[in-house]
UniProtKB/Swiss-Prot annotation:
May be essential for the survival of the neurosensory epithelium of the inner ear. The keyword Secreted applies. It comes from Rattus norvegicus (Rat). It is found in: Secreted. Ear specific. Expressed in the cochlea and vestibule, but not in the cochlear nerve, cochlear nucleus, spinal chord, muscle, cerebral cortex, cerebellum, diencephalon and olfactory bulb. In the cochlea, expressed in fibrocytes of the spiral limbus, spiral ligament and suprastrial zone. In the vestibule, expressed in cells located to the stroma below the macular and crista sensory epithelia and in the subepithelial layer of the walls of semicircular canals and maculae. The gene is Otos. Transmembrane segments: none annotated. The lineage of its organism: Eukaryota, Metazoa, Chordata, Craniata, Vertebrata. This is Otospiralin. GO terms for cellular component: extracellular region.
Amino acid sequence: MQPCVLWWLALGLLLGIPAGAKPTPEEADPNAQPPAMPYWPFSTSDFWNYVQYFQSQGAYPQIEDMARTFFAHFPLGSTLGFHVPYQED
């Protein structure tokens, strides 16, 4: 019994100690395009009316998706993960 326990302990230590291998970082795809900016064809008041409607329904994930689409058209869209083209004032 004793040699069996020692054998499994030694095997566990050998397999449990990392060999120093590091995962290779994934390279960025050179052909990958940033996500396209979503289109919001409605007015600002329409947006807030939709927000109130979804709040009354308790549909908070839909509000978040709609807000990302709406606010992507403003200069802060780049902070939401969308590529916002340069606009002159």
